[in-house]
Structures are given as C-alpha cells and as structure tokens.
C-alpha cells in the first residue's frame, strides 16, 4: 500500500472538483487513458494527474481506468459480519464476469483519492484493507472475519491511497460528516461491463 498526502499541488483544481456536479454523479465510467484520448472531463484530468507524469507507482501496462465516486454520511449503513459499514466489505472485480461466469478477475491496482476539504471534519469512514485476503479465500467457505489485522486508513484532504483493490476492503460506519471520494481502478483488460 502507498499513501501520499498533499499529492495534488494545484489546489484550485481541487476546488473545481468540490463544486462540480458532473464529477460527483453516480455510476461507473471507463477512461481509455491520455495516450488513447484526450481527457474530456475533470475526472479524466484527475486520473491523468495521478497516473501520468506524477505516478507514485512503478510503471504498469494498463488498458485503462474504471472510475466512480462515493458520497457517504451517517445514513449509509450496511451490516456485514456483525459490524456496521458505510461501504460493506468487498473485493473489486469484473462484476459482470463474476455474475455471468462466477469468475473473480481483479484490477491491477486500486486507488482512492479524497479531493474535498470537508473530509477532515469526518468522524468514522475509515478505509479497512486486508492485504492478505484475496477473493479466493472467501469463495469456498463464504466471507469470514480475517484473523489478520487490517490496515486502517483515515480519510484526509488531498490524500492518495494506492492498494490492491482485489483484496478485502470496506469503509467503516460514519458517525458524523460527509465522506466524498473517487475510486480509480487500473485494469490490464477492460472489464466486460464496458465492452457493450
């Protein structure tokens, strides 16, 4: 896992993100990357800032970027393994392929970025991540609470988190405040959902 604070130096760009309704619109999107098409919106511009010249991760060959946003507050509550979560424990995967063929194919790399200052007022909403808990451990016996201790990362304004999104992770229950984040997964092959 890589965590970098104050990653984006252009704070005016982050202010634009905070107030841009299109940036925060729900749903999953795909971006082929700056080498295949010019960025056409703020999300794609952010992806380029994170992964082009400024990439904190060694170069990887990628087919592109799946991206989406989440806005959570205290009303978002899911229960899993007798605990309450804003975003329940899960593995990022090619969702359509998993539903159609029961195959788990995970992204190369996962990214979470917190572009809004209000995140610093948040209570709860921690990212829990188990580096040694891939989906194969849960397939036969169902999901169970891991013996290993998770990494627990506090959301923070302008914090970039790079991690293995194919391993178990989730977001703890929010006590107060609002948690807005963008998630970006790098894939070596475009997920089947985007092939239609």
Please state what every model-predicted region is.
Residues 1-160, 166-196:
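Fe(II)/2-oxoglutarate oxygenase catalytic core
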């Amino acid at each position: 896992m890589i965590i970098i604070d104050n990653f984006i130096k252009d704070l005016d760009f982050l202010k634009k993100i905070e107030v841009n309704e299109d940036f925060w619109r729900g749903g999953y999107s795909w971006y082929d990357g700056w080498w295949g098409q010019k960025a056409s919106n703020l999300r794609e511009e952010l992806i380029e800032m994170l992964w082009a010249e400024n990439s904190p991760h060694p170069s990887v060959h990628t087919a592109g970027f799946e991206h989406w946003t989440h806005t959570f507050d205290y009303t978002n509550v899911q229960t899993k393994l007798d605990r309450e979560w804003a975003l329940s424990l899960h593995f990022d995967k090619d969702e359509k392929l998993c539903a159609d063929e029961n195959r788990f194919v995970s992204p190369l790399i996962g990214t979470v970025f917190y572009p809004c200052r209000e995140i610093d007022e948040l209570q709860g909403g921690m990212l829990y991540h188990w580096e040694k808990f891939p989906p194969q451990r849960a397939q036969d016996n169902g999901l169970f609470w891991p013996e290993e201790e998770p990494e627990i990362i506090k959301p923070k304004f302008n914090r970039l988190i790079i991690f293995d999104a194919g391993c178990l992770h989730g977001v703890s229950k929010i006590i107060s405040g609002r948690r807005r984040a963008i998630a970006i997964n790098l894939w070596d092959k475009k997920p089947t959902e985007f092939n239609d």
